[in-house]
Amino acid sequence: AVGYYPSLVESDEYTQTRGDGFLSDLCYAWEKEAKRCPQPTRLVITRFGVVLSPDGGAMQQMLRPLRATKVAAVIGPGTQPFPWIDIRDLCRAMAFFIENEELRGVFNLVAPQAVSQSTFTRAMGKAYHAWTTLIVPQTVFRLLYGEAASFLTAGQSVRPTRLLEAGFHFSVPTIEKLFEETDHSTVDR
């Protein structure tokens, strides 16, 4: 997961610094175990952003309050990065790793378009015809979710540098393209 990286600092696979806290520690521990693979096993470590599907998944959860109230809720202040990837690009990237045996090491699976949480929420609100956008203070999420709120209130600014260098082309490179291709009737269930 991209939670490996420090919050609010632009990072890519060449970044040597890791973040602080539970998520970064968990990612580090997973990767440390993966690196124990015996040689000559080819190891590709993938760090995912939020995986979004035009058919539901995490997007259904994010849309629940919007559908109920017609209000798009920005997690305050909204400036935190929101690293994401379309599930179709994620699947294509996995096939890309399998087909290109020279690839190894760490790869960030995030769209090339970096967006803030506010930008994402406003685009979602526009696509789903929200009446308004409301900024919900981070403290509300901290009270509701405790330390788990950090998944929502802090974000990592992550680039897929190595994936792009390897010649991978994203079919859904922007959040606007994601919402254009979303089957709203499926996600609205």
Labelled PLM ranges:
Residues 18-47:
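Active-site Tyr-X1-5-Lys
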Residues 17-23, 49-56, 76-87:
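Glycine-rich "substrate-gating" loop/helix at the edge of Rossmann-like oxidoreductase active sites
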Residues 1-20:
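Conserved Rossmann-fold NAD(P)-dependent oxidoreductase catalytic core, especially the SDR/UDP-sugar
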Residues 150-189:
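C-terminal amphipathic/interface module of NAD(P)-dependent oxidoreductases
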Residues 35, 63-72, 79-114:
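Alpha-helical substrate-binding/gating segment
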Residues 90, 94, 109, 120, ...:
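Non-catalytic, hydrophobic alpha-helical segments
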Residues 97-147, 180-189:
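Mid/C-terminal beta-alpha module of Rossmann-like enzyme folds, strongest
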Residues 7, 28, 40-41, 52-61, ...:
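Glycine/proline-rich active-site loop of Rossmann-fold NAD(P)-dependent oxidoreductases
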